[in-house]
């Protein structure tokens, strides 16, 4: 990204990031890498890292994403979600002081045992947020203003409220993603596989 920032002149006239790049040998975008150290107490394993892009959207809703439990970013729930046998209770712990819905039993979904390949293939999966939104039936009260900052656009909330599917929402940004992929091509360090 820093090479692209320089190449596209995004910092303004005559400003450049000072870069030193040491490429990895035998690496491609398909290479699996296991983090030797958890990047955060709330991302304790690779499953949480792979689920993060989708589950972090709950930070902009009334739903818990499991902070203050043994499965942060690997489960989600709310005290009023119905139809689920999985439950968890967020507690104040190191790395998650006073998490949302602290000391409240939340009902929801455990994603910790999903096959890693399916999580990676799904990528930025909006179905979890859509599922919770429909289950809680709270309308606009489901979301906080932070949701738009997380998702990056203002139409996702509206489309969820209108009953659109994850595929319909993703179709809205498909062309933008393809344009970005073309724009970034000259700056890639590793082959796209």
Predicted feature residues:
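Intrinsically disordered, low-complexity boundary segments flanking structured domains
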Residues: 4-11, 59-63, 75, 93-100
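Generic structural "secondary-structure junction" signal
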Residues: 24, 57-60, 65-67, 77-78, ...
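C-terminal regions of mature proteins
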Residues: 164-193
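Extracytoplasmic
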Residues: 14-16, 70, 106
């Amino acid at each position: 990204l820093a090479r692209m920032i320089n190449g596209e002149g995004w910092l303004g006239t005559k400003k450049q990031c000072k870069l030193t790049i040491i490429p990895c040998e035998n690496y491609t975008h398909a290479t699996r890498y296991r983090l030797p150290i958890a990047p955060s107490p709330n991302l304790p394993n690779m499953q949480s890292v792979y689920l993060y892009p989708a589950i972090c959207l709950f930070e902009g809703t009334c739903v818990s994403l499991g902070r203050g439990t043994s499965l942060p970013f690997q489960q989600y729930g709310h005290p009023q979600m119905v139809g689920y046998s999985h439950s968890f209770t967020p507690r104040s712990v190191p790395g998650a002081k006073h998490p949302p819905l602290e000391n409240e039993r939340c009902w929801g979904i455990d994603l910790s045992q999903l096959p890693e390949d399916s999580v990676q293939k799904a990528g930025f999966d909006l179905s979890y947020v859509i599922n919770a939104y429909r289950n809680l039936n709270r309308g606009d009260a489901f979301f906080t203003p932070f949701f738009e900052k997380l998702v990056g656009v203002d139409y996702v909330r509206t489309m969820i409220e209108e009953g659109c599917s994850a595929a319909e929402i993703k179709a809205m940004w498909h062309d933008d993603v393809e344009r970005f992929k073309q724009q970034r091509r000259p700056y890639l360090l590793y082959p796209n596989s």
